Amino acid sequence: MENFTALFGAQADPPPPPTALGFGPGKPPPPPPPPAGGGPGTAPPPTAATAPPGADKSGAGCGPFYLMRELPGSTELTGSTNLITHYNLEQAYNKFCGKKVKEKLSNFLPDLPGMIDLPGSHDNSSLRSLIEKPPILSSSFNPITGTMLAGFRLHTGPLPEQCRLMHIQPPKKKNKHKHKQSRTQDPVPPETPSDSDHKKKKKKKEEDPDRKRKKKEKKKKKNRHSPDHPGMGSSQASSSSSLR
């Protein structure tokens, strides 16, 4: 102990209270513990304040788990349950998804010509037949000469008679409405003898030449008395001169 004090010196004095330094009153000492018997003057320990029924429980001090929500209720449907068996759809599933449909080769190659579903040995179109019996071809490609190209050129000239009327469209025929003819026509009432006699009399009156002549004379008289008639002014002038 003497060696320790010789090395580090004597123990320093404790720091003075804040009142001695001029910073105001210091921290009060802790209260003494209550007696074991618990007399009438002792107060009960402080408890957490109960929140009103309408207030939010998250803000109130409800213990260490006041921020956690209530756990969801237990449900029958979970991720591990088989929905097909739960809803009794096993028969429908086996009916539509259990059978294996045989698909043809033409379903995968719809753009290829010919009979695709037949084997290639029938029409000699397999790869083996091409390897064993290659087609006969020339050794090299020869360009087309000018005389051969002349057969594909278009030359100006008159059109043949067969092709002259090809651009003219034929007139469209007016199709009669068949549905109108197919409709049931109303039956025409039979003519009575009195109606036929009346029609005959009307025709005779219209064909009478004297009546036509009378109509023409009436029209002429009306035209003479009308102011638009050209001879009206001269007749009025002659009548006025005779009166003088």
From Swiss-Prot:
Q: Spell out the subcellular localization from the entry.
A: Nucleus
**What is a single molecular function from GO for this protein?**
transcription coregulator activity
What does the record list as GO biological process?
Answer: positive regulation of transcription by RNA polymerase II; positive regulation of transcription elongation by RNA polymerase II; positive regulation of transcription initiation by RNA polymerase II; RNA polymerase II preinitiation complex assembly
Bias-annotated ranges (Low complexity): 234-244
Any one GO CC term of this protein is: nucleus
Q: Which terms are listed as keywords in the entry?
A: Activator, Nucleus, Phosphoprotein, Transcription, Transcription regulation
Composition bias of kind Basic residues appears in: 171-182, 212-224
The chain's coiled-coil residues are none
Query: Which residues fall in a compositionally biased region of kind Pro residues?
Result: 26-47
Q: What quaternary arrangement does the UniProt entry report?
A: Component of the Mediator complex, which is composed of MED1, MED4, MED6, MED7, MED8, MED9, MED10, MED11, MED12, MED13, MED13L, MED14, MED15, MED16, MED17, MED18, MED19, MED20, MED21, MED22, MED23, MED24, MED25, MED26, MED27, MED29, MED30, MED31, CCNC, CDK8 and CDC2L6/CDK11. The MED12, MED13, CCNC and CDK8 subunits form a distinct module termed the CDK8 module. Mediator containing the CDK8 module is less active than Mediator lacking this module in supporting transcriptional activation.
What this chain does, per the entry, is described as: Component of the Mediator complex, a coactivator involved in the regulated transcription of nearly all RNA polymerase II-dependent genes. Mediator functions as a bridge to convey information from gene-specific regulatory proteins to the basal RNA polymerase II transcription machinery. Mediator is recruited to promoters by direct interactions with regulatory proteins and serves as a scaffold for the assembly of a functional preinitiation complex with RNA polymerase II and the general transcription factors.
State the protein's name.
Mediator of RNA polymerase II transcription subunit 19
